[in-house]
């Protein structure tokens, strides 16, 4: 968690909120769809998605990315890690894997969800969810510069 882009305590707190939902998903043995506060649904999300364990629903919210080549569920293509953890769906088996790995090490949630650690990560395209953030409680200025919504009115709280 110690990196130049985020404030340590806030970043850990955000990760733990996701971790808590992963734990609930695993314990309840139910599929979960997780949204962060800035997630806006811009297109229909199919009730049934033929994904394996963890599937991003969110359009990349920072930096450069690659568009998946086909519509529907694809291997994670936009980046090597989730392009923001603002919207994703997971099955209990995926939640269990995320929890087990977090016992070994953890990082900011989006970069924690990385293909090198979790090769079955997928994403749904076209992305039905976008992050429309106007503030952050997690990032430092360095972490905001690549955000697509970052401008002079963006607040670092």
Regions found by a protein language model. Give the residues of each.
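An acidic/histidine-cluster motif and surrounding catalytic segment
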Residues: 1-35, 39-157
């Amino acid at each position: 968690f110690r990196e130049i882009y985020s404030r340590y305590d806030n970043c850990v707190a955000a990760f733990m909120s996701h971790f808590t939902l992963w734990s609930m998903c695993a314990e309840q043995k139910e599929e979960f769809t997780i949204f962060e506060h800035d997630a806006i649904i811009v297109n229909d999300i199919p009730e049934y998605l033929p994904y394996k364990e963890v599937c991003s629903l969110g359009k990349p919210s920072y930096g450069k990315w690659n568009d998946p080549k086909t519509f529907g569920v694809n291997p994670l293509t936009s980046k090597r890690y989730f392009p923001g953890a603002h919207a994703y769906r997971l099955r209990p088996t995926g939640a269990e894997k995320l929890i087990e790995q977090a016992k070994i090490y953890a990082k900011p949630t989006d970069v924690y969800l990385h293909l090198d650690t979790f090769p079955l990560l997928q994403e749904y395209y076209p992305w039905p969810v976008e992050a429309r953030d106007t503030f952050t409680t997690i990032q430092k200025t360095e972490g905001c510069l690549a955000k697509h919504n970052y401008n002079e009115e963006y607040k670092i709280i």
